[in-house]
């Protein structure tokens, strides 16, 4: 899972996509919201949107202070890779 970062207006923006079966998007979105709530004090903004372009996936964006960039990167990697390993998506449309 590749994370992209943009620095703008004194904030860091972390953007990544999680490719997951559309039938299980509810489960993945619940996990994204759970992650956001767990670390809400670190975030300024959170956006999630759904796409089927180039495969079924949810795109996620978090905004936070630049000094938290390394911590967020590690937490996103750890959290969502664990989720994908424990609950792989196996059913396309």
Placement of each model-derived feature along the sequence:
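An acidic, charge-biased composition feature
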Residues: 1-93
